[in-house]
Amino acid sequence: MKAAELRNLTNEELMNLLEEKKRTLMNLRFQNVLGQLNDHSQISKTKKDIARIKTILRERELGVRR
């Protein structure tokens, strides 16, 4: 997801999405260990999505506008 799309979501929606992405990352890591993961780039994409969500939540906490 792009940061602009994420900024249109509410804090509650972002928190729910963050939990979903964390579960997805955990599942991807398990699949990777078991050798079932075909597209390894999904792990880094999911980690970057998590970072984007956390950044937007922190910006809102500090009152930073973008």
From Swiss-Prot:
InterPro entries: Ribosomal_protein_uL29 (IPR050063), Ribosomal_uL29 (IPR001854), Ribosomal_uL29_sf (IPR036049). Keywords: Ribonucleoprotein, Ribosomal protein. GO terms for biological process: translation. GO terms for molecular function: structural constituent of ribosome. It holds the Pfam family Ribosomal_L29. One of its GO terms (cellular component) is cytosolic large ribosomal subunit. NCBIfam families: L29 (TIGR00012). Belongs to the universal ribosomal protein uL29 family. This is Large ribosomal subunit protein uL29.
